[in-house]
Amino acid sequence: MSEDRQGRSGDSNKILYCSFCGKSQHEVRKLIAGPSVFICDECVELCNDIIREELEEKAQSARSSLPKPREILEVLDQYVIGQLRAKRTLAVAVYNHYKRIESRSKNDEVELAKSNILLVGPTGSGKTLLAETLARLLNVPFTIADATTLTEAGYVGEDVENIIQKLLQKCDYDVEKAQQGIVYIDEIDKISRKSENPSITRDVSGEGVQQALLKLIEGTVASVPPQGGRKHPQQEFLQVDTKNILFICGGAFAGLDKVIQARSNDAGGIGFGAKVKSSERKQEVGKILAEVEPEDLIKFGLIPEFVGRLPVVATLEELDEPALIKILTEPKNAITKQFKKLFEMESVELEFRPDALSAIAKKALKRKTGARGLRTIVESVLLDTMYELPSQENVSKVVVDESVIEHKSEPYLIYQAQPAPAKAASGD
């Protein structure tokens, strides 16, 4: 019956009907034939409306789920101690970046430029942790690349497009997800060119890498081999558009403060009108770095085009002893909290005395490792205890004080009081 009603496309005498709304070919403007089915122009339009509404709802949902700068800062505060200026800069930059992605789908007349980020700060000041926390908060794919391993295409080393392959691996080769991810490129200062003047010889791990990264950071379609594959001519590649990927580059930039000071001194002039620089300013490296200008980065060894692709610059200060003590105890995933949890699994309480925390912070400062060195110090002083503890009985508490850190003495072990053995009843 239904076959008679729909008709066959090859039978010109039969009246054809839409398989969805049931209208005949005479009641609609156009009837499109498929394999044993028909759809009219009205149903096609209705389907388009349904899809459009769903896309708008999805975009609305994405807008509502995008945290505001203040909310981003609040989350960063839970994991990263200090560095308020850098955190505020990052919060605004990341919020604007994902708003820009939304605006591209609306076909606005004004096209918003991409704003990648450069983090400048000493080792262990929190650059990588900031980038990781942002990616976790926004629930986007995230990968870390080491700039020192990168070389120009055709040379021994990692091709810059390997960065995108790593990002794809993080999201199971979902290209759409990867295209809205975050890439953190560490040690970016190590690829500065060796001199201010362009070199005649090839600098495959310096200026050459900067040139190779330019297009990737600005926005290009990168060809990446599929899962488990290696590049060869006969292979089909995955095409990944990098224009919406947020690139965060970080580096210690040792010596940049001297470049900034030299510029400031030149600007001061000489003679009666010269500005007198205080001796205190020489000590405040963090404050000097906060005055960084694009020309300073170019003088340091980044090429002008590369500096232009990183318009947002956030500087981080060197962490002092009070900040390191806070890092040990306050963040959600603080090092002391992690070790306390490990000992708790053995039904043992772990206590760090205030003098121990201060000694750990001083040791990290002496080693110039910043927050990154804190875990190494705690690991080393607790290693023997963590080795012996599972085999020991009746230990209720482990105490770490200054002597454990400074003199490498053993932590104090406090044992549970053993119940006195019951007296045997005397037989009369």
Curated annotation (Swiss-Prot):
HAMAP family: ClpX. The gene is clpX. Residues 6-59 form the ClpX-type ZB domain. The keyword ATP-binding applies. The keyword Chaperone applies. SMART domains: AAA, ClpB_D2-small, zf-C4_ClpX. It comes from the Bacteria. Component of the ClpX-ClpP complex. Forms a hexameric ring that, in the presence of ATP, binds to fourteen ClpP subunits assembled into a disk-like structure with a central cavity, resembling the structure of eukaryotic proteasomes. Pfam families: AAA_2, ClpB_D2-small, zf-C4_ClpX. InterPro entries: AAA+_ATPase (IPR003593), ATP-dep_Clp_protease_ClpX (IPR050052), ATPase_AAA_core (IPR003959), Clp_ATPase_C (IPR019489), Clp_protease_ATP-bd_su_ClpX (IPR004487), ClpX_bact (IPR046425), P-loop_NTPase (IPR027417), Znf_CppX_C4 (IPR010603). Keywords: ATP-binding, Chaperone, Metal-binding, Nucleotide-binding, Zinc. GO terms for cellular component: HslUV protease complex. One of its GO terms (biological process) is cell division. Belongs to the ClpX chaperone family. ATP-dependent specificity component of the Clp protease. It directs the protease to specific substrates. Can perform chaperone functions in the absence of ClpP. ATP binds at residues 122-129. This is ATP-dependent Clp protease ATP-binding subunit ClpX. Zn(2+) binds at residues 18, 21, 40, 43. One of its GO terms (molecular function) is unfolded protein binding.
